[in-house]
Amino acid sequence: LVMAGVESGRDGHIARNNNCVYVCFIEYTYIGTSRINCNDLCTKNGAKSGYCHQFSEYGNSCWCIDLPDNVPIKVPGDCHLQ
C-alpha cells in the first residue's frame, strides 16, 4: 500500500529545541513575556489541537495532538537550559 501526500503526525509534549517542554498553568504558557494558550501554541505549529496536560511526567506542560514530524516533542533525557 502506497500513500502519497499524506503527512504523519504524532501526539506529544511540544518542546523547545533544547528538549524543554512548555510549562503551563491551567491552559496558558509563556513565550518570553507573552502569554499563549496551549491550544494556540500547538495549532500554530501545525497540530490539530492541544491542551495543558496537568500532572504529567514532565509537570504541567502543553500536549499537542497530531503535531507534524518537523516540530520537536519532548524525548527522554534532560532539558538543556544552556
Swiss-Prot record:
> Which keywords belong to this entry?
Disulfide bond, Ion channel impairing toxin, Neurotoxin, Secreted, Signal, Toxin, Voltage-gated sodium channel impairing toxin
Distribution of this protein across tissues and organs: Expressed by the venom gland.
Span of the signal peptide: 1-8
Record the organism. Mesobuthus eupeus
GO cellular component terms? extracellular region
User: What name is this protein filed under?
Assistant: Sodium channel neurotoxin MeuNaTxalpha-3
- Determine if Cell membrane is one of this entry's keywords: no
Superkingdom: Eukaryota
